[in-house]
Amino acid sequence: MILGVCVALGAIALTVYLYRKFFGALYYAAKIGGPPGYPLLGNALLFINKPPPEFFLTLQNTIQESGKCFRLWLGPELLIVVTDAKVAEAILSSPKYIEKSGEYDFLRPWLGDGLLTSSNRKWFANRKIITPTFHFKILEQFVEIFDQQSNIFVDQLLPKAETGECFDVFPLVTLCALDVICESAMGTTVNAQILSDSEYVRAVKEITYIIHLRTYDVMNRYNVLFSLSSYRRRQDKALKILHGYTNSVIQSRRQALAQRNSGKATVDGRPLTDEEIREEVDTFMFEGHDTTTSAISFLLYRLAKHPDIQRKVYDEIISVVGEDRTLPVNLSQLNEFHYLDLVIKETLRMYPSVPFFGRKITENSEIANITFPAGANIIIMPFFMGRDPDYFDDPLHFRPERFASEMSAEKSNPYRYVPFSAGPRNCIGQKFALAEIKSLTSKILRHYEILPPQQDQHQEESFIAEVILRPTHGIPIRLQKRQ
């Protein structure tokens, strides 16, 4: 009798809790507005079975129809899409909203509780430990790696320049960026540019593909369904290779890695475990190769389309480093590439490497006169903010000079231009990334002129917005060797 009463009371309490949680979210979400949905499915039918480019176009059309802040239901999952700079500022600038949204859970099998995916206390501790890694003195050492790997890259491009063929530069940049981040993060080389079909390189490609797949494939978003698919088995196989490689490096370089962390890295007064080191190294591996690949590739694409801008960048590079192509570029010289800096900023405005940032709302919150219900995933979209005429004049026109004036787009609209996120969870490696982009771009331009495809090979811009922004049809360019 007593047991029955306890069970009944427990069931009632659970029902009340679920009712308040779900129907409270329904109530506040209805006030936000968004496209009409269906019972149980919500808006999932908008996106089910759509390939990535169509998924992106559907999202773009929904933004145009629903405004700068609206809700989407993917089954029981509530997403609130934000392209309003004021709302983005309120969320990104506040230490209250540092928990990442559910989309980042797709990274956890590879990255564990690294800096990108961890929350609250662990994130604060990890951030404090890792920040010194990007001090400018250490960055100078990384620039040497950038230059060495860039030399290999321009050698790999030579056959393309000699034939004058049109080719997709994106996968080649990926291999170079992978070599850079492996040597920078682990102090070892995987020779991805030379051994592009090695087991490790294939595993990186496989795991990044699966992570990206889960961001747009509605059926694979949910762990129950994903665990039944062949992708789960493929993921496990790739992770065995990736974690095994990182663990072997840690074991062989334990002392060197400890010194790189000044020998004082602790969490709650204890040294980092091998697993914690692996999580941070793997986080660098993921964040450090895919994001820079996207940025460099779209930058090369724009330089090919705008020969006048390319010429100005080239002239600036030569004025700083001279005409001897064999001389390496140091950090001080990279910092003198002021016009190239403007071109990079304009590229990231139109093609942010990370097209969205996600945050989880842990309690009902009033933000910019909107009540965001607890449990909602907030998706902030810098891609669409960067192309919004309310925020940027003539936004589809590539004009680096918009960042040069005292009242530049970057300064007057700080949360309308957030390619590296902003606030307490901004990208810790942005100086590293910008230095790498400048180093590789300057090396390419010292050796080659970048040309667009022939007219009959031209394709309209089309994007895949996964964790990283990718071009649907690659980045086709041609090269001409400089005399």
Which residues fall in each region the model found?
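Cytochrome P450 heme-thiolate monooxygenase catalytic core
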Residues: 99-107, 118, 141-294, 312
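Cytochrome P450 heme-binding "Cys pocket" and the immediately downstream C-terminal segment
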Residues: 307-310, 430-468
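Cytochrome P450 heme-thiolate "Cys pocket" and heme-binding signature region
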Residues: 132, 287, 368, 406-437, ...
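Classical protein tyrosine phosphatase
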Residues: 31, 81-83, 90-91, 189-191, ...
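N-terminal membrane-proximal hinge/A-helix region immediately C-terminal to the signal-anchor transmembrane segment
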Residues: 2-121, 125, 140, 144-156, ...
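C-terminal helix/juxtamembrane-tail motif
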Residues: 2-4, 13, 468-483
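Conserved cytochrome P450 K-helix E-x-x-R motif and the immediately C-terminal K′/meander segment
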Residues: 45-61, 65-67, 244, 248, ...
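Conserved cytochrome P450 K-helix/beta-meander segment immediately N-terminal to the heme-binding cysteine loop
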Residues: 380-408
